[in-house]
Amino acid sequence: MKIQLIAVGTKMPKWVEEGFQEYRRRFPHDMPLELVEIPAGKRGKNADIARILQKEGEAMLSAVPKGARIVTLDIPGKKWDTPQLAEQLEAWKLDGRDVSILIGGPEGLAPACKAAADQSWSLSALTLPHPLVRIVMAESLYRAWSITANHPYHRE
């Protein structure tokens, strides 16, 4: 099973890339974590936000591999603690499909992305900066994997 983070935004600061890569390289070969960056639409004073969201959503959905489980990252989604995320990860592995996790831009996700989702996950009730979300996601998924693999990374 491959896990793919599909995120709106490119040209992240170096610390974001380094943080994400630190956790990405820890994943086992049979569960690679990859990042697909979707260019953000140009936003300005007179920007058509609905149109920008639609375009970003189309690009995100076209990046999802055929047959992959789609999980949206959205505040109203399910709130999983670490053991629950580990259970989800195990269920995804047993399902046998790749997993694509969609991370929206400043205005969130397009309605089409939400409609296409198999699941919706709320990372936090807090509004987090999108660059930081990439690192938190990578670490959270790695920690969940470590629980399923009985790896000593996670401690209760």
From Swiss-Prot:
**Which of UniProt's keywords are assigned here?**
Cytoplasm, Methyltransferase, rRNA processing, S-adenosyl-L-methionine, Transferase
* GO CC annotations, alphabetized: cytoplasm
Residues bound to S-adenosyl-L-methionine are 73, 104, 123-128
- One of its Pfam families is SPOUT_MTase
InterPro entries from the xrefs?
Answer: Alpha/beta_knot_MTases (IPR029028), RlmH-like (IPR003742), tRNA_m1G_MTases_N (IPR029026)
Identify the domain of life: Bacteria
Which GO terms fall under molecular function for this chain's record?
A: rRNA (pseudouridine-N3-)-methyltransferase activity
Q: Briefly, what is this protein's role?
A: Specifically methylates the pseudouridine at position 1915 (m3Psi1915) in 23S rRNA.
User: What is the name of this protein?
Assistant: Ribosomal RNA large subunit methyltransferase H
Task: List the source organism.
Answer: Vibrio campbellii (strain ATCC BAA-1116)
Lineage summary: Bacteria, Pseudomonadati, Pseudomonadota, Gammaproteobacteria, Vibrionales
Gene for this protein? rlmH
